[in-house]
């Protein structure tokens, strides 16, 4: 995914945007050969928009429409159009709480990434940290993956493990997974920006330095 210049990143988020902050900080430190081209949110007072504007990144609220779990067609066209106008190379989902549909997936096929709080394919979907506790696993973690039409089912780019402690609660485990996400996501985006990621079907390999 390496481009002639810096990778242009578009970010979608619905909440505080802590993973976006981790990536943006890595960009500003020169650890990722990229620039934040656009930040979009379906929540008008989302923290991710406030942070983006405070750091003078282009940021916009997109009214999501009438559905609770997905964008309506008009909103999806607005998101696609905004990202295309910003000449985005890679779409980064950072706590975006709506399902992406066919038009969006086709427009950015192979160029959308997400992070999930489990070691996929284990525990897809919501409350993955609670699923891990309920199943009694001893190790969980987080996964960066490409986005496809399924639920947390795209090809896996990278993973980081987190030990499950005997006295963990859903809240304490979630906090440690979240901290791991802030390490893993920038590392994976940096590898994509540097052209170090190769994809063949479901197999993703990293070119070593």
Task: Say what each PLM segment does.
Residues 1-209:
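One-carbon transfer enzymes
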């Amino acid at each position: 995914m390496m481009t002639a210049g810096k990778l242009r990143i578009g970010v979608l988020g619905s909440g505080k945007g802590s993973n976006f902050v981790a990536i943006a900080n890595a960009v500003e430190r020169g650890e990722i050969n990229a620039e934040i081209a656009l930040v979009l949110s379906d929540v008008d007072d989302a923290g991710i928009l406030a942070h983006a504007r405070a750091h003078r990144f282009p940021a916009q609220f997109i009214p999501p429409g009438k559905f609770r779990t997905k964008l309506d067609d008009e909103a999806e066209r607005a998101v696609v159009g905004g990202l295309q106008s910003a000449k985005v190379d890679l779409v980064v989902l950072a706590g975006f709480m709506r399902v992406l549909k066919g038009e969006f997936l086709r427009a950015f096929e192979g160029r959308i990434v997400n992070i999930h709080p489990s070691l996929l394919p284990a525990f897809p979907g919501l409350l993955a940290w609670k699923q891990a506790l309920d199943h009694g696993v001893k190790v969980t973690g987080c996964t960066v993956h490409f986005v496809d039409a399924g639920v947390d089912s795209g090809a896996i780019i990278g993973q980081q493990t987190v030990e499950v402690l005997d006295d963990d609660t859903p809240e304490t485990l979630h906090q440690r997974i979240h901290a791991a996400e802030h390490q893993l996501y920038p590392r994976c985006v940096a590898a994509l920006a540097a052209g170090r990621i190769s994809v063949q079907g479901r197999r993703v390999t990293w070119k070593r330095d």
